[in-house]
């Protein structure tokens, strides 16, 4: 961990990858510790910004890392500014993209935004939600269409004057596309400026983002200075590696754990996270003391699965998931480690149940699979399935789950 991060309170430093700028000279524009101190002295909570573009429908545990940090600021008495990027989502953040993103309609963005807020806990008890929506002074929900929808051409030109083509092409994603001859639409250059202008509009002190967001957050800092505001600090958190152990967690890569999944499915997936990621998951997704863990790697993995599941589903649901996971093999195996694994890479999705069990060689043929299912001999994660035509849309519907035929045939689905 960087020295300037070590100096921060634990609730801020945990999981933090970078804080910029990091000059602790005492200037509140350059020193976050000084800004934090002034906030306490003046009894003026920091305004902590997190922007989300509702380009999809589901939140996964990788997304939750940023929301957990925002909640930590709320719990410390500061104000969370949750910006719903209903305007910028129609452009699409070009970060990490090798081609221009498809633009979404207003209705699509609005529907996605409502789904996001529900998953974040709007209307729920704070102890059961990712963010605390119960105290008005602790959260502002803003939509950036409030200030971007009616931005006139004069203001757009003023924004554009604060950046250069050279600066934009220095951004890795643009640079790679430019060098390879892949088209870059002019509206994509606007995205970092519009995200930066969000910081001006809400006068943020801190902006949270993934490690891929440094350019955009720095743009916000520059624009705040140009508009006569105290510039924000950028706090960057890691991008969670997915269940495949190789690539970032992403629904399009079928390697996610969704926060809306049932507790047994969540626990089962987490229990099979690659060994080298277990401590990372514990560090980023829980508040557990990493110095007090078992020396047994398998026990640590089960502990991680239990604690992460309990954060989203509650401790009782997590314990039940762990118990039911073990019960799946009661009487046939001594432990879950004895269950063989198999990949669904050779299965064509969407897949019907009878085809799946035949393709995974759990049954000798599709007709046998139909007979077994109709006869009540087939289970998934301990739940009996009776419809041979039950459809699984993507590998993510199955990864981490245990397939069972009869009393002795088990298989755990892997990536």
Swiss-Prot record:
PROSITE patterns: S4. Keywords: Aminoacyl-tRNA synthetase, ATP-binding, Cytoplasm, Ligase, Nucleotide-binding, Protein biosynthesis, RNA-binding. GO terms for biological process: tyrosyl-tRNA aminoacylation. A motif ('HIGH' region) lies at residues 54-63. Residues 351-415 form the S4 RNA-binding domain. One of its GO terms (cellular component) is cytosol. It comes from the Bacteria. Pfam families: S4 (PF01479), tRNA-synt_1b (PF00579). A motif ('KMSKS' region) lies at residues 248-252. CDD domains: S4, TyrRS_core. It catalyses: tRNA(Tyr) + L-tyrosine + ATP = L-tyrosyl-tRNA(Tyr) + AMP + diphosphate + H(+). ATP binds at residue 251. Coiled coil: none annotated. It is found in: Cytoplasm. GO terms for molecular function: ATP binding; RNA binding; tyrosine-tRNA ligase activity. Homodimer. Catalyzes the attachment of tyrosine to tRNA(Tyr) in a two-step reaction: tyrosine is first activated by ATP to form Tyr-AMP and then transferred to the acceptor end of tRNA(Tyr). PANTHER family: TYROSINE--TRNA LIGASE (PTHR11766:SF1), TYROSYL-TRNA SYNTHETASE (PTHR11766). Belongs to the class-I aminoacyl-tRNA synthetase family. TyrS type 2 subfamily. This is Tyrosine--tRNA ligase. It comes from Prochlorococcus marinus (strain NATL2A).
